[in-house]
């Protein structure tokens, strides 16, 4: 069970809703993914323009918890303004804080992320900040009182997978709130690996929406997250330098 603030979820896969070929493919992918939390960029939504089409009209919103994000914000002030706009729409009380500090890498600005997180927590938001794999920054965000931390596996949309498993492991080890690996996931193997490291969840978008068959990939990601979590809970065997026979010679009959 994934617990974020007062909410509990069966699925540990969080799915982004952008860049799908069309709304029907998006709907099918969302459904087969089993995801219960859907994220979207507030700036790309027509939440106050009912005559304009948006993906919300295509989904049964009783099945999902919406997680708007502040994509496009470059300062804490912009992120806070976007978050307030999302809350005013009446659709949600959770917010993914995303303050980009570099246009080329789309890596988050740590200082502005901390500022925005602190303000939004004071205003009563359920805050999930997108951050780098900086161990100390993740700790600071946690100490502020955020409801989850979302370290990136690698740059957004890069598909590079987990480039620094050590840092992610350290973030997970020190965490007292859920750790949701966000950004850079490119394949089911990446998602499974994140879960095997002990992450509480995985958020991805491009890996599904950009796949040759987004619906099949959504199902693959669902199974990968489940398998990775089971593997983590089961406990992998330790790595050793030399072989150990699975059928020891002791006790064997002489043929």
UniProtKB/Swiss-Prot annotation:
Metabolic or biological pathway, per its Swiss-Prot or TrEMBL entry: Cofactor biosynthesis; thiamine diphosphate biosynthesis
Source species, domain of life: Bacteria
Biological processes annotated in GO: thiamine diphosphate biosynthetic process
Active-site residue list: 96 (schiff-base intermediate with dxp)
Binding of 1-deoxy-D-xylulose 5-phosphate, residues: 157, 183-184, 205-206
GO cellular component terms, A-Z: cytoplasm
Protein EC: 2.8.1.10
Subcellular location field: Cytoplasm
UniProt-listed InterPro entries: Aldolase_TIM (IPR013785), Thiazole_synthase_ThiG (IPR033983), ThiG (IPR008867)
GO molecular function: thiazole synthase activity
Coiled coil (residue ranges): none
Pfam family name, one: ThiG
Function: Catalyzes the rearrangement of 1-deoxy-D-xylulose 5-phosphate (DXP) to produce the thiazole phosphate moiety of thiamine. Sulfur is provided by the thiocarboxylate moiety of the carrier protein ThiS. In vitro, sulfur can be provided by H(2)S.
Quaternary structure and interacting proteins, as annotated: Homotetramer. Forms heterodimers with either ThiH or ThiS.
PANTHER family: THIAZOLE SYNTHASE
Protein name from the UniProt record: Thiazole synthase
């Amino acid at each position: 069970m994934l617990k974020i603030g007062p909410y509990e979820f069966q699925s540990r896969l969080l799915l982004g809703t952008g860049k799908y070929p069309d709304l029907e493919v998006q709907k099918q992918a969302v459904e087969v993914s089993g995801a219960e939390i859907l994220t979207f960029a507030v700036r790309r939504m027509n939440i106050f323009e009912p005559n304009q089409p948006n993906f919300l009209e295509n989904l049964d919103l009783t099945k999902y918890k919406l997680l708007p994000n502040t994509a496009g914000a470059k300062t804490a002030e912009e992120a806070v303004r976007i978050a307030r706009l999302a809350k005013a729409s009446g659709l949600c009380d959770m917010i993914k804080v995303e303050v980009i500090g570099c246009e080329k890498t789309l890596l988050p600005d740590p200082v502005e992320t901390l500022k925005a997180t602190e303000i939004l927590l004071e205003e009563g938001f359920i805050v999930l900040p997108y951050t780098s794999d900086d161990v100390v920054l993740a700790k600071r965000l946690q100490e502020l009182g955020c409801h989850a931390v979302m370290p990136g596996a690698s740059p957004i949309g890069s598909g590079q997978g987990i480039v620094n498993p050590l840092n992610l492991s350290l973030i997970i080890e020190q965490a007292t709130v859920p750790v949701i690996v966000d950004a850079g996931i490119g394949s089911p193997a990446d998602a499974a690996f994140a879960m095997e490291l002990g992450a509480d969840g995985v958020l991805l978008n491009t890996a599904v929406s950009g796949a040759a068959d987004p619906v099949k990939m959504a199902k693959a990601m669902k199974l990968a997250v489940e398998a990775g979590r089971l593997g983590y809970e089961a406990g992998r065997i330790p790595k050793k330098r030399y072989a150990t026979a699975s059928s020891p010679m002791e006790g064997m009959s002489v043929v």
